[in-house]
């Protein structure tokens, strides 16, 4: 997959994208990420990329010309190198659709993505109307710009691309992939400061271990994210276990 990030602050990405899983995916040429500085495409003398909003109001708004010129340069590169002619253009915005695991799975099937990071009070609406295919939000809170949301999206999507993780099971058992929160994890030592690993995990009985993990996931989800259970298909054993949990309240 190829991901192009349109941003005013490309240096923000070097740390998060230059380590761990994302770094290895790029070294193995499974993933190619390039941050493109929008300011480089400003046609005015001082490389100015923002201006006061029409109608008044606080803050500054990113002007359309540098963003659209940056986008057109990226699209031309895709076309010249026989990549995707029209990749999705995702604007990271608090007004966008809430990002979740299902969306990450869909995006991981794309060959290329262009991510647009806003700043200041946002970007000129005409840019959104002209080039943006999707607006995505990572949550109901305010951030300084779209760079951190872009990193979140890249990390969530990249780990779903075949070959990025060493084992598919690594993400299939994680929180949200199955629809439930992940069960607690334990490693050595068996006892730490008086706290022991649950006996079932050292029993060698794999069916009991699976049952324990399933029940732990159900209980955690019930207490912390009950909204996830509304659309989750429960087995009869799941339903019985949850009834027992409810009776303890």
Swiss-Prot record:
<keyword id="KW-0963">Cytoplasm</keyword>
<keyword id="KW-0949">S-adenosyl-L-methionine</keyword>
<comment type="similarity">
    <text>Belongs to the RNA methyltransferase TrmD family.</text>
</comment>
<dbReference type="InterPro" id="IPR002649">
    <property type="entry name" value="tRNA_m1G_MeTrfase_TrmD"/>
</dbReference>
<feature type="binding site">
    <location>
        <begin position="138"/>
        <end position="143"/>
    </location>
    <ligand>
        <name>S-adenosyl-L-methionine</name>
    </ligand>
</feature>
<comment type="subunit">
    <text>Homodimer.</text>
</comment>
<dbReference type="InterPro" id="IPR023148">
    <property type="entry name" value="tRNA_m1G_MeTrfase_C_sf"/>
</dbReference>
<protein>
    <recommendedName>
        <fullName>tRNA (guanine-N(1)-)-methyltransferase</fullName>
        <ecNumber>2.1.1.228</ecNumber>
    </recommendedName>
</protein>
<dbReference type="InterPro" id="IPR016009">
    <property type="entry name" value="tRNA_MeTrfase_TRMD/TRM10"/>
</dbReference>
<feature type="binding site">
    <location>
        <position position="118"/>
    </location>
    <ligand>
        <name>S-adenosyl-L-methionine</name>
    </ligand>
</feature>
<keyword id="KW-0489">Methyltransferase</keyword>
<keyword id="KW-0819">tRNA processing</keyword>
<comment type="function">
    <text>Specifically methylates guanosine-37 in various tRNAs.</text>
</comment>
<dbReference type="GO" id="GO:0052906">
    <property type="term" value="F:tRNA (guanine(37)-N1)-methyltransferase activity"/>
</dbReference>
<dbReference type="InterPro" id="IPR029026">
    <property type="entry name" value="tRNA_m1G_MTases_N"/>
</dbReference>
<keyword id="KW-0808">Transferase</keyword>
<dbReference type="InterPro" id="IPR029028">
    <property type="entry name" value="Alpha/beta_knot_MTases"/>
</dbReference>
<dbReference type="GO" id="GO:0002939">
    <property type="term" value="P:tRNA N1-guanine methylation"/>
</dbReference>
<dbReference type="GO" id="GO:0005829">
    <property type="term" value="C:cytosol"/>
</dbReference>
<dbReference type="Pfam" id="PF01746">
    <property type="entry name" value="tRNA_m1G_MT"/>
</dbReference>
